[in-house]
């Protein structure tokens, strides 16, 4: 096997935040300390007390 360099450990940026529910790294909502991706947020938002106004 050839040389392999593991990816650098990130300290900040989009790849650091992880969804608490599914582990996804893209489109994570950090506001209010949620740390949920937008798909998981849509599934559990009503149970958490968020309500649609429109």
From Swiss-Prot:
DNA damage among keywords: no
One GO molecular-function annotation for this sequence? zinc ion binding
Q: Which UniProt keywords apply?
A: Metal-binding, Ribonucleoprotein, Ribosomal protein, RNA-binding, rRNA-binding, Zinc
* Annotated InterPro entries: Ribosomal_uS14, Ribosomal_uS14_arc, Ribosomal_uS14_CS, RIbosomal_uS14_euk_arc, Ribosomal_uS14_sf
- Pfam families (UniProt xref): Ribosomal_S14 (PF00253)
The domain of life for this entry's organism is Archaea
Q: Which residues bind Zn(2+)?
A: 19, 22, 37, 40
Names of required cofactors: Zn(2+)
Instruction: Report the GO terms under cellular component.
Output: cytosolic small ribosomal subunit
Keyword rRNA-binding, does the record have it?
Answer: yes
Q: Which GO terms describe its biological process?
A: cytoplasmic translation
Q: What does the note accompanying the cofactor annotation read?
A: Binds 1 zinc ion per subunit.
Q: Which NCBIfam families match?
A: PRK05766.1
Q: What do we know about how this protein assembles, alone or with others?
A: Part of the 30S ribosomal subunit.
Similarity remark: Belongs to the universal ribosomal protein uS14 family. Zinc-binding uS14 subfamily.
Question: Which function does this protein serve?
Answer: Binds 16S rRNA, required for the assembly of 30S particles.
- The name under which this protein is listed is Small ribosomal subunit protein uS14
Mind giving the lineage of the organism this protein is from?
A: Archaea, Thermoproteota, Thermoprotei, Sulfolobales, Sulfolobaceae
């Amino acid at each position: 096997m050839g040389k392999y360099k593991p990816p650098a450990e990130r300290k900040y940026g989009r790849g650091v935040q992880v969804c608490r529910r599914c582990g996804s790294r893209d489109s994570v909502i950090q506001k209010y300390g949620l740390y949920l991706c937008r798909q998981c947020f849509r599934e559990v938002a009503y149970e958490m007390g968020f309500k649609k106004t429109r």
